[in-house]
Structure formats: C-alpha cells, structure tokens
C-alpha cells in the first residue's frame, strides 16, 4: 500500500485535554472531532474510540493515551486525550510536555476539583505554555450567577499557578449536547476552535537547533526493520541522515531510513511533530523508551547534575513528611524514570514539603541531558517534586 504524502500547508499545533475525572475530557475530544469534521473535513472520532486508548506500557505501569487530529479554519491540530485515572500524572509528565496548549475541562456542575488543581500545577511544571478553559455541562446549570462563580474560581486557580487567569478564554458549553448535534452547543465547539486559533500562538519551533527525539516506543515491523516513535523535540531529521542513540546504554550510531506521521510518509521530520522513525540495522532489543535519537555529537549522557527542585506540599498531593540526604526517589526525564540519590547543601539537614531546594542528584544509569532539562520526582506512584537541571557535573 503506497502511503500518501502528509499535507503541510497549515500550521501544526499540539494540544490536549486536562482536568478532573468525569468532567468530560473524552466527550469534549469526541465533540471537537465530530463538529469540526462537519465544517472543515477530517475524521470524527466516537467517544468509545478515544476512551479505548491504546495501552502503552511504561516500566510495568500501563498508560493509555489517545491521539486524534482535526482541522480548524487556520490550523491542523494533533490532540492527546489522557484518561482520568490515578496514573494520569505520569501521562502529564510524559505526555503533556507535548502540548503547545491545553484545554482545561471543568464541569460547571462541580467547579474546580482536586485533579483540576493538580493538572494546572503539573501543566506549570512540565511547561504547558497556554491553557484555555472549556466550562462543560453548562446545559445542566440554569443559574447564571453560579456559572460566574465557577468561572471566577477557575481564574483564581490559574492565577495561583502563574497562568494569566484574568485573560484566559473560558468557553461555556456542553460537550455531550454538541456531540448529539444541538446547534447552539455545536457553535460553542466552533467558538473553542476559534479560541485555540487566536489564543495559542504558533509555537516558535526549535527547527534550527540540532535534531533530538526522546524515544517513547520501539517496535519492529517485519520486512522493514525497527521503528521508534516520539515527538521531535528540536531540529529536523531527513531520510538518509546519521543519528546517535544516547542514554541508558553506550551511545551507538545508526541511519534513518524512513519518517512517517499519521501513517503518511515524509522526506523529513521536524521539531514539534509526532513521528515514527525507521532505523537501519538496529535491533528491537538494542533500543528502549527513555533513550534519545540525536544528531551525532550534540548531546551526551550524564549521571550527576545540580538541580533546582520544587517539592510539592502535602496540599498539592506531595509528601506529608520531610526527606533527608540519601533519599532515593525516581527521577523522570522526558519519557523515562531513573532511580537516583540526592545530596543536600551543607547547612541543610532535611527538606520539607513546599520547599525550594538546590540539590545534587546521582542517577543509577546515564540519561541524555543538558542544562535546562526538566524532570519530575516521583515515589510510590505519585509526583512529589519537579525540577530543572542547572549544571551537569558528570
């Protein structure tokens, strides 16, 4: 089957839905694809299709993520929907880093809930630059004052985490009614699409920087070879170019023999795109999630670094007790978690939840890193901190 070439005529933007469980993230995702496919072409995705997100295994923990695509008048969007279970957080850390903007779904019937707060916080930590709010289930609230109250609460919460709460577009709608084809609610989906076009700037893509792709998944395609998938963090990779596989194991070189996106073949992959990369002569078992593909000589694996870390408070879902030197949590880099131990500054005995701290981390195996790389700290299945690499030591 020959694959058609991917159309690049519209700017390409990555977005996703975030918010509390059962507030309607998946229903909204389905409504967006359904309403926009009527106006601008493309494929409508049913709730069930999106809800049955393919399972992705990450170190024995199953994560589900659904990718859909749609067009607005001006742009092409790739949209990720994360199911709202307890492991959502892990998905935020690996997945929300893939968002140029997020649609925060808040049910007007409930207002902001604990996961609403947690997702905003994580959006801040993992670098989601813009948030738009879809106030869902407005068909079930007759009281205008109540809607205004919920809006105010959401704006305050966003402001609390350094998003411009006062200026963020809030669209009042009903995903379910839009999905059922009621025009007044369908128009709200169009309003949301217009807000995405207006409010989320076309990101300054890092296409001029050296190529780097964090590997999310690896599989072999019989007769063709090994394919790795992920979102290109920066640069451009052309078919035929040499790349290095960096991190976890010894660095190796290979050649890119194919690039594809949404099952369409490309001559090259560019920063910001979710792609599959076909590698020449590389065995499935030689490569794993958590490594990166990079332009040769541009990034090195390291195990020891200085970092600035924010430790989540108990209220934010963090630890209830302090930790001390020798603490050994997991450090999440891009798509992987690595155990590491910490050293605290000389005069500091312990770190309290809610503190900011400068710490030196030593990982048990090397990760491709440079200054400015962000990470999360996790233990026992929950996020307890977020940080950034300030200086590479070894």
From Swiss-Prot:
List of residues binding Mg(2+):
26
Q: Per the database record, which ranges form the tr-type G domain?
A: 10-204
Cite the residue spans of the region called G2.
Answer: 60-64
Q: Where is this region: G5?
A: 174-176
Please state which protein family the record places this protein in. Belongs to the TRAFAC class translation factor GTPase superfamily. Classic translation factor GTPase family. EF-Tu/EF-1A subfamily.
Outline the subunit composition.
Answer: Monomer.
Please report the name of this protein according to its UniProt entry. Elongation factor Tu
- Native organism is Buchnera aphidicola subsp. Cinara cedri (strain Cc)
* Gene transcribed to yield this protein: tuf
């Amino acid at each position: 089957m020959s694959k058609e070439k991917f159309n690049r005529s519209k700017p390409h933007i990555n977005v996703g839905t975030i918010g509390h469980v059962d507030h309607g993230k998946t229903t909204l995702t389905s409504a967006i694809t359904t309403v926009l496919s009527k106006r601008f072409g493309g494929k409508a995705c049913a709730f069930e299709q999106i809800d049955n997100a393919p399972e992705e295994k990450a170190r024995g923990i199953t994560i589900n993520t659904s990718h859909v695509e749609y067009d607005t008048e001006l742009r092409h969007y790739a949209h990720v929907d994360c199911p709202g279970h307890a492991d959502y957080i892990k998905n935020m850390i690996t997945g929300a880093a893939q968002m140029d903007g997020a649609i925060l779904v808040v049910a007007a019937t409930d207002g902001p809930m604990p996961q609403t707060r947690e997702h905003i916080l994580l959006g801040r930590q993992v670098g989601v630059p813009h948030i738009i709010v879809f106030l869902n289930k407005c068909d079930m609230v007759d009281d205008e004052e109540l809607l205004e109250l919920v809006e105010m609460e959401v704006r305050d919460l966003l402001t609390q985490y350094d998003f411009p709460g006062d200026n963020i577009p809030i669209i009042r709608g009903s995903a379910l009614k839009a999905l059922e084809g009621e025009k007044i609610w369908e128009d709200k989906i169009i309003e949301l699409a217009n807000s995405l076009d207006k409010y989320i700037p076309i990101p300054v893509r890092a296409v001029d920087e050296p190529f780097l792709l964090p590997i999310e998944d690896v599989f072999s395609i019989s007769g063709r070879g090994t394919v790795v998938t992920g979102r290109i963090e920066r640069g451009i990779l052309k078919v035929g170019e040499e790349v290095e596989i960096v991190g976890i194991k010894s660095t190796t070189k290979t050649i890119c023999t194919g690039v594809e996106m949404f099952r369409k073949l490309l001559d090259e992959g560019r920063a910001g795109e979710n792609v599959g990369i076909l590698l020449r002569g590389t065995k499935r078992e030689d490569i794993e999630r958590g490594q990166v593909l990079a332009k040769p000589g541009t990034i090195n694996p390291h195990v020891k670094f200085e970092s600035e870390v924010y430790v989540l408070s108990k209220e934010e879902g963090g630890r209830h007790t302090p930790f001390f030197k020798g603490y050994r949590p997991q450090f999440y880099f891009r798509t992987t978690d690595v155990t590491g131990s910490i050293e605290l500054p000389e005069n500091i005995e312990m770190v309290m939840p809610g503190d900011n701290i400068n710490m030196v981390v030593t990982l048990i195996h090397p990760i491709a890193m440079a200054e400015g790389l962000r990470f999360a700290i996790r233990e026992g299945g929950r996020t307890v901190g977020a940080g950034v690499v300030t200086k590479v030591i070894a």
